[in-house]
Amino acid sequence: MQKDTIKIAIAGPRGRMGSEAVKLVEDTAHFELVGAIDRTYNREKLSDVMTSSSDAVIYTDITECFSETSPDVLIDLTTPEIGKLHTKIALEHGVRPVVGTTGFSESDLNELMELTDEKGIGAIIAPNFALGAVLMMKFSQMAANYFTDVEIIEQHHDQKLDAPSGTALKTAEMISAVREAKTQGHPDEKEILPGARGADQNGIRLHSVRLPGLIAHQEVMFGGDGQTLKIRHDSYNRASFMSGVKLAVEQVMKIDQLVYGLENIIE
């Protein structure tokens, strides 16, 4: 289903990502911001509590927001646990979720897949909304057909709660789909300090860096005989994610199943 104007509710509008999403919706002619979900400021106008031109009302109860504003889409940019809860509630109310939080397990995704099938509406969960990061993952999967030794180094700001990042895990998953699991490095290698070689997913080593001054960065490093290949993406501000959010909102109106990963809607 495609509508001329897409009515949107945003969860977490005052956060760093959420405030960018508010700007995106306000600046997009065929988007309409009809409500927001926040922990505080119940029933106040968004424009009264943050820099915004919107008169959309803030709700601390997500079900009240849905019943009173009837959004088509929920953009959720909160935390992993809240994001999981909001996604389920949205689907139960016939609202299509576009979710930028990570931490969804395979069982979580299976449950949500059943719910989208039952409701006949779409949902998009994306570990990363930056289109460049999505292309990095796709290019890395292509490269893994030719280079089987690979490690992933992801770097994020020091307020990020999960490690490794959802993008790193998704990248490793995509590489594993075309590469047999293998043990990398010397078979007798020993970690002098536990964890020095990073986390292990199907033989792929994942390394996480957390420092102030960073936003979101990832390098996928492949090694072969006499050569290396590095595929890197850097997000220098959170505006870099908004083109992917816009694409996801538009695409979620056209699908009737759960899509995990923005790479699955990029042709």
From Swiss-Prot:
Pfam annotation, one family: DapB_N
List of catalytic residues: 156 (proton donor/acceptor), 160 (proton donor)
Biological process according to GO: diaminopimelate biosynthetic process; lysine biosynthetic process via diaminopimelate
Keywords: Amino-acid biosynthesis, Cytoplasm, Diaminopimelate biosynthesis, Lysine biosynthesis, NAD, NADP, Oxidoreductase
Residue sites binding (S)-2,3,4,5-tetrahydrodipicolinate per the record: 157, 166-167
Record field: catalytic activity: (S)-2,3,4,5-tetrahydrodipicolinate + NAD(+) + H2O = (2S,4S)-4-hydroxy-2,3,4,5-tetrahydrodipicolinate + NADH + H(+); (S)-2,3,4,5-tetrahydrodipicolinate + NADP(+) + H2O = (2S,4S)-4-hydroxy-2,3,4,5-tetrahydrodipicolinate + NADPH + H(+)
Protein's pathway: Amino-acid biosynthesis; L-lysine biosynthesis via DAP pathway; (S)-tetrahydrodipicolinate from L-aspartate: step 4/4
Gene3D superfamilies to which the protein is assigned, alphabetical: Dihydrodipicolinate Reductase, domain 2 (3.30.360.10), NAD(P)-binding Rossmann-like Domain (3.40.50.720)
Subcellular location: Cytoplasm
Membrane-crossing segments per the record: none
EC number: 1.17.1.8
Residues annotated for NAD(+) binding in this entry: 12-17, 100-102, 126-129
Source superkingdom: Bacteria
GO MF term list: 4-hydroxy-tetrahydrodipicolinate reductase; NAD binding; NADP binding; oxidoreductase activity, acting on CH or CH2 groups, NAD or NADP as acceptor
Gene Ontology CC: cytosol
Signal sequence coordinates: none
Function: Catalyzes the conversion of 4-hydroxy-tetrahydrodipicolinate (HTPA) to tetrahydrodipicolinate.
Family per similarity comment: Belongs to the DapB family.
HAMAP family: DapB (MF_00102)
Name the record gives this protein: 4-hydroxy-tetrahydrodipicolinate reductase
Species this protein is from: Bacillus licheniformis (strain ATCC 14580 / DSM 13 / JCM 2505 / CCUG 7422 / NBRC 12200 / NCIMB 9375 / NCTC 10341 / NRRL NRS-1264 / Gibson 46)
Phylogenetic classification of the source organism: Bacteria, Bacillati, Bacillota, Bacilli, Bacillales
Name of the coding gene: dapB
